[in-house]
């Protein structure tokens, strides 16, 4: 039935669905995992790197995380070439606002501006939607630290913790379980991000070259966006593995004690 309605983006099916937009969302479901966590003292993005090759130039170190302006960064899941077009557009919107009003663009306004463009591509014939979902982290004077997510339909929302890409449903349920509202520090958020990626990524063992992590904090009245170095990511993974081993030992000891009873 759907074949008659999915060749053009602008045609609704009898059930009121836009199949092309749904297919674009499907493309994101096969992309590398990206997650964002909001903490009291900052906000972070963690992403899975699929394109790891020892001959790749380290100059282009960041594959999934893009800096947009002094106060915002984003992470992408989906078709990378589409993502490049959208991140360039985001940077332009931010620069135009800065030029016009002499102050940085509020986070939500930047997200809304891009979502308007994404939405337009679901409405005009002869175009296809962008096959990209984005996670945005940022700080502005109105609402402090913020985390947003947008999808190919032009929909967006503010989140405390969320995930896009492969195995996102499992990751979101883990975040829901372990996210402590009002108590999250950046340190505990980093540990949680590594824990979630370790469980949801399709690899037998988590390694530093497969993960990209960026943090956004405030220091001396300025926003600082940092992409963690490989050594730092290695330390986080090592710490997580030690904690896992410790928890496993304690569990076995407890089971043994119960048996002895």
UniProtKB/Swiss-Prot annotation:
Transmembrane residue ranges: none
Flavoprotein found in the keyword field: no
Modification type N6-acetyllysine: residues: 127, 176
Keyword Cytoplasm in annotation: yes
Location of the protein in the cell: Cytoplasm; Nucleus
Tissue: Ubiquitous.
Modification Phosphoserine occurs at: 13, 75, 173
CDD domains named in the record: proteasome_alpha_type_4 (cd03752)
Region (Disordered): 240-261
InterPro entries the record matches: Ntn_hydrolases_N, Proteasome_alpha, Proteasome_alpha-type, Proteasome_asu_N, Proteasome_bsu_CS, Proteasome_sua/b
Entry keywords, A to Z: Acetylation, Cytoplasm, Nucleus, Phosphoprotein, Proteasome
SUPFAM superfamilies hit by this protein: N-terminal nucleophile aminohydrolases (Ntn hydrolases) (SSF56235)
Domain of life: Eukaryota
Pfam families assigned to the protein according to its UniProt record, in alphabetical order: Proteasome, Proteasome_A_N
A GO CC annotation given for this chain: proteasome core complex, alpha-subunit complex
PROSITE patterns the UniProt entry points to: PROTEASOME_ALPHA_1 (PS00388), PROTEASOME_ALPHA_2 (PS51475)
Described function: Component of the 20S core proteasome complex involved in the proteolytic degradation of most intracellular proteins. This complex plays numerous essential roles within the cell by associating with different regulatory particles. Associated with two 19S regulatory particles, forms the 26S proteasome and thus participates in the ATP-dependent degradation of ubiquitinated proteins.
Subunit: The 26S proteasome consists of a 20S proteasome core and two 19S regulatory subunits. The 20S proteasome core is a barrel-shaped complex made of 28 subunits that are arranged in four stacked rings. The two outer rings are each formed by seven alpha subunits, and the two inner rings are formed by seven beta subunits. The proteolytic activity is exerted by three beta-subunits PSMB5, PSMB6 and PSMB7.
Protein name: Proteasome subunit alpha type-4
Organism: Rattus norvegicus (Rat)
């Amino acid at each position: 039935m759907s074949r008659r309605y999915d060749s053009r983006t602008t045609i609704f099916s009898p059930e009121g669905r836009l199949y092309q937009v749904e297919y674009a969302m499907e493309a994101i479901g096969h992309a590398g995992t990206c997650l964002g966590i909001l903490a009291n003292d900052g906000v972070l993005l963690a992403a899975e790197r699929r394109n790891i090759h020892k001959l790749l130039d380290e100059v282009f170190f960041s594959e999934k995380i893009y800096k947009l302006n002094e106060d915002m960064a984003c992470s992408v899941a989906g078709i990378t070439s589409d993502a490049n077009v959208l991140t360039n557009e985001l940077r332009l919107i931010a620069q135009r606002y800065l030029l016009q009003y002499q102050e940085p663009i509020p986070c939500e306004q930047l997200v809304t501006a891009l979502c308007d463009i994404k939405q337009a591509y679901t409405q005009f014939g002869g175009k296809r939607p962008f096959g990209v979902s984005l996670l945005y982290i940022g700080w502005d004077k109105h609402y402090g630290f913020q985390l947003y997510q947008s999808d190919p339909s032009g929909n967006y929302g503010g989140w405390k913790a969320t995930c896009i890409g492969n195995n996102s449903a499992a990751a979101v349920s883990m975040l829901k379980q372990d996210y402590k509202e009002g108590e999250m520090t950046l340190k505990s958020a980093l540990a949680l991000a590594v824990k979630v990626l370790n469980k949801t990524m399709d690899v037998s063992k988590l390694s530093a070259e497969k993960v990209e992590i960026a943090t956004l904090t405030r220091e001396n009245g300025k926003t600082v966006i940092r992409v963690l170095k490989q050594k730092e990511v290695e330390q986080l993974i090592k710490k997580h593995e030690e904690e896992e081993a410790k928890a496993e030992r304690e569990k076995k000891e407890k089971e043994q004690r119960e048996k002895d009873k």
